[in-house]
Amino acid sequence: MFKIKAADGTNNLCGKRIAEIRKEKRLSQRKLAIKMQLLGFDVDHYFIRRVENGERFVTDIDLVIFSRALNIPISELLPEDMAL
């Protein structure tokens, strides 16, 4: 199956932004995973790591949960240039 990757070869466009925002909010990957679990999303800190490192594809549902857990609009999770 063919899968589209970002220009930098990663599997998502939002991983770096998620890591930046998480660090700005002084959250560990484990604490972010717990916040997402409290929203009913079954994840652990390995999921967060894989997203941030660009190893995992991210769905629209993932974006919604990240935005709710980080208390930010979804648009802030995406890079400004959106280059593929």
Features from the language model and the residues they span:
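Residue-level signal for the short linker/turn that defines the boundary of a DNA-recognition helix
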Residues: 13-16, 26-27, 43, 58-61
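A short, Lys/Arg-rich alpha-helix, primarily the initiator
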Residues: 1-25
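Short alpha-helical DNA-recognition segment
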Residues: 26-50
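Alpha-helical residues within the helix-turn-helix
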Residues: 23, 34, 68
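Short, charged recognition helix plus adjacent turn
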Residues: 2-9, 68, 75-84
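Residue-level detection of the helix-turn-helix DNA-binding "recognition helix"
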Residues: 23, 37-38, 53, 82
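DNA major-groove recognition helix of helix-turn-helix/homeodomain DNA-binding modules
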Residues: 55, 59-76
